[in-house]
Amino acid sequence: MRILSNVNLMGLLIVLLAAIFFCFHNVIVRILYSQQNILGIWQVGGFVTPTLSHSFLLLLLRMLWVVPLMALISQRLYGNTWREINQLKQPVNRPVIWEAMGCGFLMFLYLVLLYISISFIPTGIAITLFFTYPIFTALLAWRLFNDVPSLLRWLVIGLTLIGTFLTIPYAYGGEQQTLVLGVSTGIASGIVYAGYTVFAQRSFQRLHPVPFTWISFATTLILSILCLIIWQPHEGNLPWLAITIGSLLSALFTLAGHVLNNWGIHLIGASRAAIIGATNPALTVVLAGLAIQESLTNIQIFGVCLVTFSIALLNYEKVSPSTGKNSLK
């Protein structure tokens, strides 16, 4: 059995830490929407009600932190960030900036849908539904680029659909409408994110991921402002200090997750990092259970594990045929 090198092991741990940071962000969003029992000790949360305008508000406050912080560290992540952004002003590069801004719109849309989903259903379930996106990515790639799914990929799609079905909560009475909304927006966020990944991958051929990501964040910020002008929250007395702190923590965990994930990709490659990243639904369930005592049924836990296994298997298929090519230099 081959022993992992120090670089490989470090890369795996870094990507795993990035996934944990993303899980913290998901739990924080849940706390902002509904009161939770933190570590079984004290009650906190429920600062905003689960409405469309509040989703815009939370996304706006998050991006108000993320955009300037990303601008500060972007030069360290990629030395030509601002030079490439300035070059986008040239008429010949207009299609590139429009592509990046279009992906920014998709980022805005999938984040709003995911926020709505988390506000209505348990965090782990919302993230599991979101992580069905590789199914739609495979179907989009088949439709747009004639990338016919392999037999293994069809098997993964089937397992993911079964896991998703097992994960969906069922209730009766007044909760049914909110559950339907939470489940549908969770799946919809995955569909939109699939489109984002497909078009982003195409944009990376002409624009580096770091300036591309900053443009997407900035576009999301602008769209959040515009939507908040149209759909203003009706409540005039919100706990702004708590919301601001929660948004700052959300931004820091998000940004740290992105930076660590990119670092891990540099060490072990994107495909291997994606296999570790596929554990996000299971990690979110564990973290939500420990931090806010969020519980799922045994069938739902099995569904989460099945989706996690399926996505990891799909990512393994991508790395397996080219293991030799992707070996570290």
Swiss-Prot record:
The keyword Magnesium does not apply. Keywords: Cell membrane, Membrane, Repeat, Transmembrane, Transmembrane helix, Transport. Pfam families: EamA. SUPFAM superfamilies: Multidrug resistance efflux transporter EmrE (SSF103481). Residues 103-169, 191-316 form the EamA domain. It comes from the Bacteria. InterPro entries: EamA_dom. The chain crosses the membrane at residues 9-29, 53-73, 105-125, 126-146, 154-174, 179-199, 210-230, 240-260, 273-293, 296-316. Belongs to the EamA transporter family. This is Uncharacterized transporter sll1319. It comes from Synechocystis sp. (strain ATCC 27184 / PCC 6803 / Kazusa).
